[in-house]
Design a protein with these regions (language model features):
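Transmembrane helix-loop junctions in multipass membrane proteins, especially transporters and channels
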Residues: 17, 25, 45-53, 87-91, ...
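Core mid-bundle transmembrane helix pairs that form the ion/substrate translocation pathway
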Residues: 16-86
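Transmembrane alpha-helical segments and their short flanking loops
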Residues: 72, 100, 135-136, 144, ...
């Protein structure tokens, strides 16, 4: 249902703008929300529901093929592309796939992939922190955006640090996620639940895979830092602010 809701929310914003344009201001408080919700729900069940279901099924099939047929390489690609899905909002469809995995097999291999993809963005933020020696504001932002990644929230790191001046830190983070994801696949890391990543993910990872889970996340964290520092030294400065 995640992909359907994602599509519906974007449609609702368009309908609301149109309704605000044509509905008289004196009754807009009542009728704009009513019109928006009505047309959005009609579209959800007649158009976006079936389309979103197809997208979700297609995404599930791609993930299954990548992870189970292409081994560590497939896991690398999956992990590397997961946060770009977050940027577009289509990542919500994966939650249903995780629930189905737990229901049918009792385990969730996507949890480890989720974790490394988020932790890698935190690594990217730390990489930017290290570069911002003369930019106190950027250092503060980078550090504060890194902390949420430890408990599974990547958006601050993505938008406040890794995409702020260049796409390079974000790409480096995605590559770090891929490395961590490949390790998770090789180590056979699995969880018995969903929704918890980073430090909190330790609560649901299969006990005999905890050490590998930690190692995979460390790989995902360290690789972006190294790549960002190397890129900055060889290709030029990634920061474009005046010292503060």
């Amino acid at each position: 249902m995640g992909s359907e809701m994602c599509i519906r929310d974007r449609f609702m914003s368009k309908v609301e703008k149109i309704a605000q344009k044509y509905v008289p201001a004196v009754v807009s408080f009542v009728f704009v929300p009513t019109i928006t919700i009505f047309f959005a729900n009609v579209a959800l069940f007649t158009v976006f529901g079936p389309v979103g279901n197809m997208i979700g099924n297609g995404l599930a099939a791609v993930i299954d093929v990548l992870y189970n047929s292409f081994g560590a390489f497939g896991a690398f690609v999956f992990a590397a592309l997961l946060q770009p899905l977050v940027v577009t909002g289509t990542h919500q469809a994966i939650q249903g796939i995780e629930a189905n995995l737990i229901a049918t097999t009792g385990f969730n291999y996507i949890q480890g992939i989720w974790s490394v993809s988020i932790i890698a963005q935190g690594g990217g933020a730390i990489g930017m922190y290290l570069l911002a020696k003369k930019h106190s504001k950027d250092r503060d932002i980078a550090m504060s955006s890194f902390i949420p990644t430890l408990v599974g929230i990547s958006e601050p790191a993505i938008f406040a640090a890794n995409l702020k001046y260049s796409v390079i830190p974000f790409v480096c983070s995605c590559l770090g996620a891929g490395c961590g994801g490949a390790f998770m696949k090789l180590a056979g890391v699995r969880a018995i639940g969903q929704g918890l990543t980073g430090i909190l993910g330790l609560l649901i990872v299969v006990p005999n895979k905890l050490v590998f889970y930690v190692i995979g996340n460390l790989i995902a964290f360290i690789v972006p830092i190294v790549l960002i520092v190397i890129y900055n030294k060889t290709k030029g400065c990634l920061l474009y602010t005046s010292p503060s």
